[in-house]
């Protein structure tokens, strides 16, 4: 069990290391933090914390740095709340006050904002189509025996599909197909559709032939597992600013990881959209390329349903209190904006 004095020493070491990226010695803690004890006492506490696995000593330094266990204990037990400052508040407010009419643009801007306020690499998953609820289906004639089927969802996510229109199908019948599809699908979540339900719908509307078959085949494809995640990145270049990634091999590994969207989706946990902030630190991520990184994520929603996730990727040595408060603030604003689409 860590006593109160060890807690204070560990918190001081972590916060100093986060600020300076330099190993921390007992004299530094005694001089900069009013702990009310001598450097010798602090040195003894640091030795104990190292023995317990919360600190590590780099080979080339007399100072200590936090271990993975030290960071984990900090975020679970010691991390203070840190309200976002006025400049961050104003940047967030002004971004979401802009008249953004496209969901795609909104998510891209949110990724840029998250990166700008945290100075880390930001990743946001767009609303997942299979998590969305059908709102309306429209059909727009394109000419040359083709039409555009538009699937509109409550999350603002829109899927388009170009379909071939049989020669005998009139404009009125096209509208009837759209109305019938809307009637059968409105209010239903995409992921709750089953192939059995789609086959039943096909039988019921069979007289519309190949046009309907194309629409239902499109929806069946949306039920298939695979590349379902739309990811938006911001501030990848921030990796270059971190002392941890002056090692070219480490940097190359992280940048290579960021190019693999399915791997990024897996680390963000896009298949487990659970409430709240989640922090993964170093070895907890179980990827060699991210051994020196942390990933912090939060979810956003439409109404009472979680529809997507946002997060930052950076060194383990990150300002966790700041990152958590900014993530919560931006997720809240994005959730409010989604209600407008």
Swiss-Prot record:
Domain of life: Bacteria
Pfam family, one: HrcA
Function as written in the Swiss-Prot or TrEMBL entry: Negative regulator of class I heat shock genes (grpE-dnaK-dnaJ and groELS operons). Prevents heat-shock induction of these operons.
Family note: Belongs to the HrcA family.
InterPro entries: GAF-like_dom_sf, HrcA, HrcA_C, WH-like_DNA-bd_sf, WH_DNA-bd_sf, WHTH_transcript_rep_HrcA_IDD
Transcription in keyword set: yes
Lineage of the species this protein comes from: Bacteria, Bacillati, Bacillota, Clostridia, Eubacteriales
GO biological process: negative regulation of DNA-templated transcription
The keyword Transcription regulation appears for this protein: yes
NCBIfam families for this protein: hrcA
Identification of the protein by name: Heat-inducible transcription repressor HrcA
Alphabetically ordered keywords of this record: Repressor, Stress response, Transcription, Transcription regulation
Gene Ontology MF annotations: DNA binding
Entry-linked Gene3D superfamilies: 3.30.450.40, Heat-inducible transcription repressor hrca homolog, domain 3, Winged helix-like DNA-binding domain superfamily/Winged helix DNA-binding domain
